[in-house]
């Protein structure tokens, strides 16, 4: 673990963690115990989703989940891939078990949704080529992991609103970012 210096007096330091064997970098803002714990959590989250996803069998979307969820996944994959709905509906995806944030029940989902490597679900990459860990969380407590997942999900939705609208609710002063007119405490 390393602590990176501040970019300027108003910016926080960063707690950074690297795993040279697995090439899994992670970081969090700050140098408090909470930020160090955050960096460790990010590290385990990335390590898990890059290196430790173990898939189950292969199933179609309608074999692994309720019809309403399968329909939603079909529409999402249709929007982000160049495949037809029929190709999506008939494809057998590698599966993993996950928690549904809305019902808190376990269900199977396509492994390509959470596996960040290009090997685990190689045959499924054409359906979901750009992946991240949005809505995923690592924690020693199941309840805290679910809460973290919900926060990750809300963070993504907020970023999407910002990107789609092209404006933020609050503008950060350039004087704060550059350190101009900074008064030390």
Describe these PLM feature segments.
Residues 1-185:
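Helix-coil modules at protein/domain termini and other flexible surface or pore-lining loops
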């Amino acid at each position: 673990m390393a602590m990176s210096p501040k970019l300027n007096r108003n910016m926080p330091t960063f707690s950074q963690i690297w795993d040279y064997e697995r090439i899994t970098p992670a970081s969090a803002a700050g140098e408090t115990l909470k930020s160090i714990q955050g960096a460790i959590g990010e590290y385990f989250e990335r390590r898990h989703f890059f290196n430790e996803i173990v898939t189950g069998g292969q199933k179609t979307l309608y074999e692994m989940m309720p019809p309403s969820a399968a329909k939603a996944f079909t529409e999402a994959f249709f929007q982000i891939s160049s495949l037809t709905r029929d190709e999506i509906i008939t494809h057998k995806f590698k599966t993993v078990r996950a928690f549904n944030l809305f019902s808190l029940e376990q269900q199977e989902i396509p492994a390509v949704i959470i596996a960040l490597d290009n090997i685990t679900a190689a045959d499924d990459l054409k359906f979901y080529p750009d992946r991240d860990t949005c809505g995923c969380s690592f924690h020693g407590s199941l309840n805290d992991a679910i809460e973290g997942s919900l926060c990750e999900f809300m963070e993504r939705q907020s970023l999407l609103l910002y990107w789609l609208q092209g404006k933020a609710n609050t503008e950060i002063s350039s004087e704060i970012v550059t350190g101009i007119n900074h008064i030390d405490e």
